[in-house]
Amino acid sequence: MAGGRATRMGGVVKPLLEVCGEPMIMRVVGEIRNLCNRIILVYSDHTSRVVDLCMGPMGSVECVKGVGGYVEDLKLALNLVSLPALVVPADMPFIDPVILEGFLLKALLTPEPVVNLVDASRGPVGVTLFKEREGSWADVVVDGGYKLLDVDTWSDYEEAVRICRDIMVVGWAHR
């Protein structure tokens, strides 16, 4: 999901903000690529600049223009794919495939048709597994630390930049 208006950040195109030298959306797609058969990126008029990445650097990513707000765009995306479907926001620069794999295993065993990933300290992060297009939901709580940082404010972005700097200082590059 990459269609948000980023009102808390003055309307910046968040998916294109760089963290560790590359746009956040590139980092997210790179980390989920091996977990998904098909990746669809839903964008909006506000975030239409991400289309340039869909045509090249992100590889086999289908870009679809959303129809409005988050709920409408989510419905659009879910109608384009077979289920189960994993929904991931474009503004989680450190998303970890190991955490996602653990979440998916737990979510698939959960009886509810919609399962949300919730970080123990940050709360809901916007990652959801849809086994059906609607219905009751459950939460899977994990302690993801910085790997589940969801950039919603400039303060979050500054934290991401700090984390990246700290990672580089110790000589460990994420990815």
Label the model's feature ranges.
Residues 1-48, 98-101:
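N-terminal glycine-rich phosphate-binding loop and ensuing alpha1 helix
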Residues 12, 35, 57-59, 81:
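Short, structured coil segments at secondary-structure junctions
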Residues 42-44, 64-67, 117, 141-143:
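Conserved beta-strand termini and adjacent loop/short-helix elements that scaffold enzyme active sites
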